[in-house]
Amino acid sequence: MSDARGPETAALPPLDEVLAVMRVVAIPTRTRFRGISVREAAIFDSPLGASEFSPFPEYGDAEASAWLAAALDFGWCEQPAPLRDRVEVNATVPAVAAGRVPEILARFPGCRTVKVKVAERGQGLADDAARVRAVREAMGPDALVRVDANGGWGVEEAVTALRALAEFDLDYAEQPCGGVDELVEVRRRLSPGDTGEGPLFGEAAATLGLHARTSPLVRIAADESVRKAADPLAVARAGAADLLIVKAQPLGGIRRALGIVAEAGLPVVVSSALDTSVGIAMGLQLAAALPLAEGEGASGAVLAGACGLGTAALLEGDVTADPLLPNGGEIEVRHPRLDPEQLTRYAAPAERERWWRERVTRCHALLSAAAH
């Protein structure tokens, strides 16, 4: 298996060629999302279709270079054939007030699975519980509800929160803590057979209007522990998660992501990083290349439910006139065409364009050095 720099078999296109087809966009978000109000991305009008490079600005060059490897692989190399032409997706609810939940859900027509952001800085468990309750009430008892803490809790906070939120019949909890060892401990304490003695049972649970279960079984999903780790397989070897959340860009592209999930042997949900439709297309092709889970108890590298690929609905605009948005709870697997009018409308300021070009140049140099 190749390392974090991308597939060893992928030829690196020359930097001049990459920069010549590059545009930078800055698209406002509809709702502040994990501190982001404007999403910036470098878009390449590549030979095999548009590709995207959009690591968040705070990421260092070593980490960002995997995202560039993904963009260059997607835009300049043939990809694995998809097994289906549509992918089921989930709605994503940012850390908004509970009263805004219906408005957010309306942007995801037909979705029967919802991921709810929790553990937002400056908020507490009462805010999370109100938000998750609003989602459950809006969606009804048959919908799947997931929570995503983005590693925002410590072990005790995670156990406390997830025992409480189990009231709402969670599908799974994504990255409740940052470290692999922490995930192992949280998973152990939320498994059947745990004593159920914790800081949010009895009186504390009643304060929030919840009825915490004695022994909640909450599956644990790993995201950051896969995509931001030097060893993306460590979480699987440690038994720290029940399933993996994989994102094509930070893992170096579709082919490398497929290699990782095959070796990990855990069920998979494919997600995005608040991408434009171009980045979403990469995620859709990854999801469509994975076999579907068949019934309960499915194991191995299979697609395990609705994917977090509907997030273009959280952007005010896009780089295509026909964005990849949920319809009937699914999105068609296709490569969107860039729209010159949208690229102009959302063009980043000149100083941000320069910043992204310099970043691509540095990351390309890292990839080039690694290839030799």
Question: Where are the language model's segments positioned?
Answer:
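Glycine-rich, proline-tolerant flexible connector loops at the mouths of alpha/beta enzymes
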Residues: E52-A62, R112-A129
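Short, charged beta->alpha transition segments
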Residues: G75-E78, A91-R107, R121-Q123, R131-A134
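Catalytic core of soluble alpha/beta enzymes
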Residues: R121-A281, Q285, E316-L324
